[in-house]
């Protein structure tokens, strides 16, 4: 997703760091991972059980939801803040703080919650699994989140290619209406709340929150300039919060089990459990729920069956979806999978889509393919992105062939820096970072490829 990824470029401002809290009396944890089954939030992640209302009720969904609603917005926001939950769509912004922006006196305009289910980030499929196998968690999360911010309704914007998932979600919404769980007097709480599904049309840029809002309004999906921010002027000109599917879906469980319980997982400022997608050169690609701050090596070896050919065959990993810089094997040995640890490693958690590449990978060609994707998906609104990504794509194509000069490596780095931070949305950043990761860690590979091409060219000339 494209939700304000620039926060990944550095540490969070000090004014928001105090928002992360946990149980200060508990001893500080030093090891992470091996999440117990009783602590898993997504208990039907693999679709082994009934996803409809009857099955959801048997797994604890919709349990005491009325009590949660009756406790009011301040109590819900308090639990979310205590939990230390950070946005699961890529930016990692404190969820309780973000939702509290909506909790202000009404000016007569209705408030809306928009759920970003436009999951288009290459390598990412966690939200798809939630919608396909646990849709009632999302519907209940919309109700609880909507209550926290005083929203009148939720719009779930789902990727156009997710046809079956959208069908399951629509069935879950209908069941919730028929059971009186949403709609008029939701759960008997006296609170009215509606949920609507909006289908996307395949544009990656609509994963950016303001482009998504434009699309819901029936306009071309192009990001808006901010300010005004969606919390002031969002969908249909009304106060709006845009939140990721996973962020919304975990909120009822946090309220039921307590923010302190959720804060007990992971390192400080990196609380909770997290869905990880592991794909690429692993023996068993999977989506798994694990504790935040789990070591990357443990995540791959325990849940994905290890790297094909063994750990020593590992070349590099993209840890957070295609828009985060890759890290080489030497970094993968010890890095933890959380926001702060990956920022220190000059990359980011992003969507937690772990793309594993072994030594058979043509790393230059792999990154070039990602740049081609971003060139295609750029909306063209900003000159640095429109022209810069096209330029990067052409240079990377020459790097793949080796038909370039070593000085062009530095030129490409400068181009990426001119794109990063100079666009309306974060798509430009997402296109620049893979290139920066490649140059930072695999510059010798680029130079060797150019040298090899030059030698072959000289040999052909000599032969002719």
From Swiss-Prot:
One Pfam family linked to the record: NADH_4Fe-4S
A GO term for molecular function: metal ion binding
Residue numbers carrying N6-acetyllysine: 81, 104, 375
EC code(s) of this entry: 7.1.1.2
Descriptive protein name: NADH dehydrogenase [ubiquinone] flavoprotein 1, mitochondrial
Modified residues (N6-succinyllysine): 81
InterPro entries from the UniProt entry: ComplexI_51kDa_subunit, NADH-UbQ_OxRdtase_51kDa_CS, NADH-UbQ_OxRdtase_suF, Nuo51_FMN-bd, Nuo51_FMN-bd_sf, Nuop51_4Fe4S-bd, Nuop51_4Fe4S-bd_sf, SLBB_dom
Cofactor dependence: FMN; [4Fe-4S] cluster
Function text: Core subunit of the mitochondrial membrane respiratory chain NADH dehydrogenase (Complex I) which catalyzes electron transfer from NADH through the respiratory chain, using ubiquinone as an electron acceptor. Part of the peripheral arm of the enzyme, where the electrons from NADH are accepted by flavin mononucleotide (FMN) and then passed along a chain of iron-sulfur clusters by electron tunnelling to the final acceptor ubiquinone. Contains FMN, which is the initial electron acceptor as well as one iron-sulfur cluster.
Residue ranges of coiled coil: none
Presequence positions on this chain: 1-20
Subcellular location: Mitochondrion inner membrane
Record family assignment: Belongs to the complex I 51 kDa subunit family.
Annotated NADH binding sites: 87-96
Enzyme class: translocase
Positions bearing Omega-N-methylarginine: 257
Record bears the keyword ATP-binding: no
Binding-site list for [4Fe-4S] cluster: 379, 382, 385, 425
Catalytic activity: a ubiquinone + NADH + 5 H(+)(in) = a ubiquinol + NAD(+) + 4 H(+)(out)
Source taxonomy: Eukaryota, Metazoa, Chordata, Craniata, Vertebrata
Membrane topology: Peripheral membrane protein
Subunit comment: Core subunit of respiratory chain NADH dehydrogenase (Complex I) which is composed of 45 different subunits. This is a component of the flavoprotein-sulfur (FP) fragment of the enzyme. Interacts with RAB5IF.
GO BP field: mitochondrial electron transport, NADH to ubiquinone
Binding site residues for FMN: 199-247
Gene3D superfamilies documented for this protein: 3.10.20.600, NADH-ubiquinone oxidoreductase 51kDa subunit, NADH-ubiquinone oxidoreductase 51kDa subunit, iron-sulphur binding domain
